[in-house]
């Protein structure tokens, strides 16, 4: 972190690349520390002031994000911005397979409070509709492994060297519990199947979201408009007006130049997405790279001095990236889906991806008109996200729509296929 002022009395200047959660978080912290900040992103309007819309004028947001109960930073931000009542109540989530309803995740805060994990076990005892109790009890070995994880650095490394699928099998977890619950949970939580994930990282996810505290898994959602409009837009206005934040949308960073003598950032080269014009910011003291591996790889390839000075960034840029596909459907009738937040499980048509879908007409029940833009509301609005979605991304828009409407979504609208498990 540079000093607040540089020699000569000018304020330190930091360029933040990327206007996602990480980029806005960095910009906020730096601005409030008295540092001049330029925030750069390829989106035309990273501030959220201009909502993203489809060609027909309907609102769209890339991905549906949940807000867990243990998000004190988000709660503090909404209070600080005076955002008001922007969230739904905490909601039940459901898991659906080709056989119908598999399980539901209750609102744990509404159940009797017991020490973890006893409280979670009691609260979910009747929430699996098809999975026999003997399969559910097979998860006991995983609870021991999670307690063992931090016993020493050596033990942690052993788990980190093992993939999660191998750990599940080694611990004797039943195939049904793995395939029908753990596998889809991990796919939508860490965006990769368990055979491609570190066992240590997977256990950290499960601990934080499900076992740390009984109600840590409780989740709620934005109940109108979008996250960008409710949070990023007021945050950007505050940082611009109070701290003179400069936001450059529709702009890509082509190169970060580093002085070979001092190994300090000397300039940042930019390109306008629309005009292809190039400009250089000379008075840069530091750069925050709030970008993914794909963007970082491109940037490092064009920044030889930086690559030489920071080989760890080259290593980070070599990591794989994850394809995510988001779709939103406006239906011509209301579909009575039992739960607003849902996870797909065991569908062959997912082609190895994880999938979720959300009934926005239920989550935004008091803001129906806003979901339809300038049109009269006609029916349900469904938002669906696919993770680890390379195969889905290669499909046409119509193919994705057909998979949702003909295969995936109908499974959650066939009550006759929801069977209560005998002996559960």
PLM features per residue range, with description:
Residues 1-14, 32-33, 54:
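Extreme N-terminal leader/targeting segments of oxidoreductases
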Residues 9, 33, 222-223, 251-382, ...:
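Mid-domain catalytic core of redox enzymes
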Residues 11-39:
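N-terminal Rossmann-like FAD-binding beta1-loop-alpha1 element of flavoenzymes
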Residues 31-54:
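Glycine-rich FAD pyrophosphate-binding loop
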Residues 52-77:
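N-terminal glycine-rich dinucleotide-binding loop that anchors FAD/FMN and/or NAD(P) in oxidoreductases
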Residues 75, 79-80, 84-199:
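Mobile amphipathic helical/loop "lid" adjacent to a hydrophobic cofactor/ligand pocket
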Residues 141-264, 273:
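Active-site/ligand-binding neighborhood in enzyme catalytic cores
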Residues 187-190, 409-424:
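Flavin (FAD/FMN) cofactor-binding core of flavoprotein oxidoreductases
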């Amino acid at each position: 972190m540079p000093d607040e002022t540089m020699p000569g009395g000018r304020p330190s200047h930091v360029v933040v690349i990327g206007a996602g959660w990480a980029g806005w978080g960095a910009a906020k912290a730096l601005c409030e520390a008295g540092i001049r900040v330029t925030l750069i992103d390829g989106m035309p309007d990273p501030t959220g002031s201009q909502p993203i819309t489809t060609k027909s004028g309907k609102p769209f947001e890339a991905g549906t994000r949940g807000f867990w109960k243990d998000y004190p930073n988000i709660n503090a931000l909404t209070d600080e911005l005076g955002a008001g009542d922007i969230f739904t109540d905490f909601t039940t989530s459901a898991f659906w397979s080709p056989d119908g309803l598999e399980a539901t995740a209750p609102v744990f805060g509404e159940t009797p409070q017991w020490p973890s994990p006893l409280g979670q076990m009691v609260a979910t005892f009747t929430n699996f509709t098809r999975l026999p109790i003997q399969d559910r009890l097979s998860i006991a070995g995983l609870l021991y492994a999670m307690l063992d994880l931090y016993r020493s650095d050596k033990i942690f490394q052993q788990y980190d060297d093992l993939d999660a699928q191998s750990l599940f099998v080694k611990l004797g977890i039943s195939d049904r519990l793995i395939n029908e619950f753990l596998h889809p949970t991990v796919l939508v939580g860490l965006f990769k199947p368990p055979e491609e994930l570190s066992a240590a990282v997977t256990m950290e996810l499960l601990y934080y979201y499900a076992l740390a505290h009984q109600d840590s898994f409780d989740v709620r959602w934005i109940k109108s408009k979008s996250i960008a409009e409710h949070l990023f837009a007021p945050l950007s206005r505050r940082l611009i007006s109070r701290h003179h934040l400069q936001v450059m949308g529709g702009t890509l960073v082509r190169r970060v130049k580093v002085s070979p003598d001092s190994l300090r950032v000397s300039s940042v080269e930019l390109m306008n997405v629309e005009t292809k014009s190039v400009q250089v910011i000379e008075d840069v003291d530091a750069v925050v790279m709030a970008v993914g591996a794909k963007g970082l790889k491109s940037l490092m390839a064009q920044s030889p001095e930086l690559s030489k000075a920071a080989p760890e960034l080259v290593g980070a840029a070599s990591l794989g990236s994850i394809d995510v596909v988001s779709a939103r459907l406006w239906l011509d009738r209301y579909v009575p889906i039992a739960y607003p937040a849902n996870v797909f499980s065991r569908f062959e048509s997912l082609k190895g991806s994880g999938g979720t879908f959300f009934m926005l007409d239920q989550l935004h029940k008091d803001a129906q008109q806003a979901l339809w833009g300038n049109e009269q509301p006609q029916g349900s609005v469904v938002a669906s996200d696919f993770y680890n979605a390379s195969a889905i991304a290669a499909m046409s828009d119509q193919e994705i729509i057909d998979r949702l409407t003909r295969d995936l979504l109908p499974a959650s609208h066939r009550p006759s296929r929801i069977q209560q498990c005998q002996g559960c």
